[in-house]
Amino acid sequence: MTLLKRDDIIKIIETCQIKGQDEAIIRALMYMNLGYPIMLYGPPGNGKTSIAEHLLRYISKGDNFYRIEATEGMTEYHTIGGFHPLSMSGNPELSRKFIYKDGVITRALQEKKNLLIDEFNRAPTTAYSGLFMLLSTGLLPVEHSETVLKKPEDWVLIVTANLGDEGTFKMSAALKRRFIPIFIGYINRFTEEKVVRVYAPKLDEKIVKAILDFAEETRRLWQEEKALPQGLSTDGVIKMTRYCDLSISEGLDGKTAFTDAAMHQGIVIADETDYASIQTINELALKIASRL
């Protein structure tokens, strides 16, 4: 990767659709300039993937990079490669023949393309044994061809992760140390209000305040009281805004529109198996709605 200059960094920030994450983006770019792989982590719905894609598009001059979304069933076959039956049909002769298919990391190295692994910790650590070796030594043995791939000096790797989220695996400390973690958290209220106004410039000020109050309080309940598994994301704020704007324009009163939107997003962030969690979010929605 060509060393990013100040003008590059300014352009990257100005053209990023995710607003309010300037400091995190600058930190990520500084470490990328030093050649480190980056892990963007934080609560879901705050733009980790969009930021990662934006950075890679700028650095790779377009979509000239690989992207894979990790899953629970992912193995080294998907990341590094492995043998695959020549045919999955009922032909017994072909089904006994195998070909070797390179995984996404191997292809990225061979073609000298940058790589994004989204939802990194939704795959078990065992899927990344080869990646661990690559990040530790700069080398990746390709067993079937008895060759060794070398990590290009300008190769960029970005992964995203929701640490501690349901359905994720705990990363080994050794693997985690190979990355520079950059936190993508909730943006401040001032910036979030500007985002709301982009989507609904004419939405009543009281409704906007109610939406932002709801988001702020869910985040407090998550961070300070642990009463919710997560707070409302900026994506959730946008969905509430758009729903209220459309509903009110079609004749629904603001109080009902807000209550509906808050209940909808409340189910997303609450623990649906925990009645107390659902009750907490419903009571919060009704409390804020009562001010309208």
Regions picked out by a protein language model, each given a short descriptive name:
Residues 1-292:
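C-terminal regulatory/interaction module of P-loop NTP-utilizing enzymes
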